């Protein structure tokens, strides 16, 4: 979590899930760039916090610009032909939350009626619009050839490469040729208006075998006892067990952020 320029009313949380040979370096570089970009943007140094009432236009544009600049920086600094990272961030501005997604990480919100709200769908190759773009660019979408389970992946036509399980990311410069794009989706919600009490942001390792509703069930008791660390540990524990049961190839990296609003 980062508090921008020590402004109490503005905080950023994020999950950056790297993949490929240089995935760890790329995810670290992108997360650091993201924070440095916001810390060094004069918009925040010079703008009183009350002006964020008109946050949407300025912040949406700032997020998009940050991601574009970050991708250009990756071109200059790291080998990203076969590696990249997803991005899922939560910007909290007073009572507003802006959620940005690029890839297959996910954020959900739980309201006072225990209803789950997901503002942005995962960017996966099997979703209709994403698949159409990939095929138009000459790519193919299928599961790994020798198994009948697991995520759909993106391939060069007739090849067994690159096998990405997400259709949007930063980096992955080879996969850009077959429709993998770095354009994020951005949406927002008001904590007070929608009576939001829990926010969970996590990499696909949490969501692969656990539904939104199951994740909600697992954390509700911890909300009542105000035990956010316990909720995070429980999700991690259950997620790892589901991987052990459902996948004999190992356990995916799992990153989880849990926020309680009281």
Please place each PLM-identified region on the residue numbering:
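PP2C/PPM-type serine/threonine phosphatase catalytic domain
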Residues: 1-262
